[in-house]
Amino acid sequence: MFRLDGIFLTHFHSDHISEIYEANLGSWVQGRPERLKVLGGRGIESLVGAVNLTYAHDREHRVSHHGADLLPPELGIMQAVELASDTVFEDGELRILAYQASHPPIDPALGFRVEYRGRSVVISGDSNVTDATLSISSGADLLLHDALSVPAVTSMSEGFAAEGRARLSKIMADVLDYHASLESIIELGSEIDIGMVAYYHLVPNPSNALFMRFFERDLPDNYLIASDGMWFDLPVGSEDIEVTER
């Protein structure tokens, strides 16, 4: 982890930010030579500042225990970098373009297109499919997109309502309008040239084979369902995408 230079955040929902400090700590203790950059939209300064403050005692204890030569205190403090929706980050042959995602009412919400030596990957963050999604994904080798099953979420909302659990019923119903439906992602693939589409951040989380069938149904040939530990290798000078489990 000592090679980790930065973390890109799509938005500030808890499930997308909760491990920031663990990444900071892990790379710091392994010898990261500079401060860890945390890049995100408007509000990133306050978020990173709050996380730094929250773990101030943790950093002090570790420096006191292991010594400042091993753990330089200044390298344990993360650095916030604000991105706009049209920001281009470049480092040598690596190019990362931020674009506006649609995750209402969350604003800002970003997605990213990553390009390196002729290969490209788009990461949706959490988003509906929009014209911006089509534009940024056109010609990409791989699109990683969150995916929601409308029938499954609707059934859960209705089930909670039938049990008199109105709060959970409303929460599930609210989820419907800020993740991309399976149908919209499949339609996207028919409208643009794209190498492969992988569903991740599945809603609802398919805890059994029955729920997984919602996502597997009508899956196009160049689509797949990603899982934790899955690697996508895009060899330079090729159009191949090698998918492995590790």
What are the language-model segments listed below?
Residues 1-122, 128, 133, 208-245:
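Binuclear metal-dependent hydrolase catalytic cores
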Residues 111, 120, 128-230:
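Cap/insert and terminal regions of metallo-dependent hydrolase folds
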